[in-house]
């Protein structure tokens, strides 16, 4: 049986994984449509590697592969899009 590599990130409204939260398994080119634009202060990467971006359409991004209990000030409440990254060599 073929097993699919699942990617999952959980985002939080406050530092230290507090406040409202939401999980994503897919790319979101505008978090505004999900009610999460510029609201994320901490996050947990449950599986995979992710790209978080300060602008819609995946612009001004950085790659993350682990939990962040306190996003740096220039990323706190500044994320507008996110997407899972494929492992190296995957089509």
Task: Show the residue positions of the predicted features.
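Compact beta-sheet-dominated domain cores in extracellular/mature segments
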Residues: 1-91
């Amino acid at each position: 049986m073929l097993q699919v590599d699942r990617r999952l990130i959980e985002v939080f409204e406050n530092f230290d994984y507090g406040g409202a939260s939401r999980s994503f398994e897919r790319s979101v080119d505008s978090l505004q449509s999900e009610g999460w634009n510029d609201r994320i202060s901490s996050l947990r990467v449950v599986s995979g590697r992710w790209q978080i971006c300060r602008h819609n359409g995946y612009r001004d991004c950085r790659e993350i592969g682990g939990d962040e209990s306190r996003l740096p000030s220039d990323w706190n409440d500044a994320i507008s899009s996110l997407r899972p990254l494929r492992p190296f060599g995957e089509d």
